[in-house]
Curated annotation (Swiss-Prot):
It catalyses: (1,4-alpha-D-galacturonosyl)n+m + H2O = (1,4-alpha-D-galacturonosyl)n + (1,4-alpha-D-galacturonosyl)m. Disulfide bonds join C35-C50, C209-C225, C335-C340, C359-C368. This is Probable endopolygalacturonase A. It is found in: Secreted. It comes from Aspergillus niger (strain ATCC MYA-4892 / CBS 513.88 / FGSC A1513). The keyword Repeat applies.
Length: 370
């Protein structure tokens, strides 16, 4: 006879040995219980009966989400062992967690393995196989994600649409994709969010380490980014929310990447990029641009013709240092007519590459020539 799906509710078992309490007390007691799940279906079905959820060595069936949406306030989710996802072409996400005052963490040796190589074909989201996004941290408010080790996501790793979310000491390791066809493996994609703090992240990938498409009061500190497209804002424009405001990138490194620091806006769109700081960013092995700010993106690619519908103002670039490849451009600024204002640059020391002669409408306080 097949065994029942395991669900161990420790506090509930302890309570069974006692006299039955009043119904309201049973409900409160159950919600304080610790539950260990070893399969995705039971975890998704029984998630609200537990305030401490342990996910141990789960293999998620093909085409399904490990769904921890709408958790009880104050729930803690802990991953143990290896969590894996079986292969199927679909959009995902592979993992979804939402709720208020939630803590998401793992044991010291745990791995969330997206098995990305099964989907990787060098196309990313531009064609080929349909690839699922990995983790939706949507409506995960007043919460914390701490210490996760995420490996080999099919495409984008963590999509953030939340308020008051802290992400600390998370590793996203898609380095296998360098040789196995990983593409569009963004580390953190942030949209329609406020008060997001990311500290101590390590991202090895083939796209943006961080991409902020919309949101306010976002802080990224102590990050280590390699292999991808750098620390990015945008593309801004053409979405429901086209405002990026009060963003700080500080005390971080970007290595072996296409870009170091990047802001990009959509041609002929409208929006606002305001109060942006990049401070103490160390660069090495940058292949395309050390600093690139351009207002000419159309259908996902730069055109060389800027527009001024998205304003970029109150930008501080300070203490950005390091080296780029010999055929890379150290600084490239392409603004629309009058759309970039109130910029300051100081302590910029980027070496090894070329000085651009194609910059346009560079605002006072900034320069393409150090």
């Amino acid at each position: 006879m097949p065994s029942a799906k395991p669900l161990f509710c420790l506090a509930t078992l302890a309570g069974a040995a006692l006299a039955a309490p009043a119904p309201s007390r049973v409900s409160d007691f159950t919600k304080r219980s610790t539950c260990t799940f070893t399969d995705a279906a039971t975890a998704s079905e029984s998630k609200t009966s537990c305030s401490d959820i342990v996910l141990k060595d789960i293999t998620v069936p093909a085409g399904e989400t490990l769904n921890l949406k709408d958790l009880n306030d104050g729930t803690t989710v802990t991953f143990e062992g290896t969590t894996t996802w079986e292969y199927e072409e679909w959009d995902g996400p592979l993992l979804r967690i939402s709720g208020k005052d939630i803590t998401v963490t793992q044991s010291s040796d745990a791995v969330l393995d997206g098995n990305g190589a099964k989907w990787w074909d060098g196309e990313g989201t531009n064609g080929g196989k349909t690839k699922p996004k990995f983790f939706y941290a949507h409506d995960l408010d007043d919460s914390k994600i701490s210490g996760l080790y995420i490996k080999n996501t099919p495409v984008q790793a963590i999509s953030v649409e939340s308020d008051n979310l802290v992400i600390e000491d998370v590793t996203i390791d898609n380095s296998d994709g360098d040789s196995e066809g990983g593409h569009n493996t963004d580390g953190f994609d942030i949209s329609e969010s406020t008060y997001i703090t990311i500290t101590g992240a390590t991202v090895k990938n083939q796209d943006d380490c961080v991409a902020i498409n919309s949101g306010e009061n976002i802080y990224f500190s102590g990050g280590t980014c390699s292999g991808g497209h750098g620390l990015s804002i945008g593309s801004v424009g053409g979405r429901d929310d086209n405002t990026v405001k009060n963003v700080t990138f500080i005390d971080s490194t970007v290595s072996d990447s296409e870009n170091g620091v990047r802001i990009k806006t959509v041609y002929d769109a409208t929006g606002t990029v305001e109060d942006i700081t990049y401070s103490n960013i160390q660069l090495s092995g940058i292949s395309d641009y050390g600093i690139v700010i351009e207002q000419d993106y159309e259908n996902g690619d730069p055109t060389g013709t800027p527009s001024n519908g998205v304003t970029i103002s109150d930008v501080t670039l300070e203490d950005i240092t390091g080296s780029v490849d010999s055929d890379a451009v150290e600084i490239y600024i392409l603004c629309g007519d009058g759309s970039c204002s109130d910029w300051t640059m100081s302590g910029i020391d980027i070496t090894g590459g070329e000085t651009s002669s194609d910059c346009e409408n560079v605002p006072s306080g900034a320069s393409c020539d150090q």
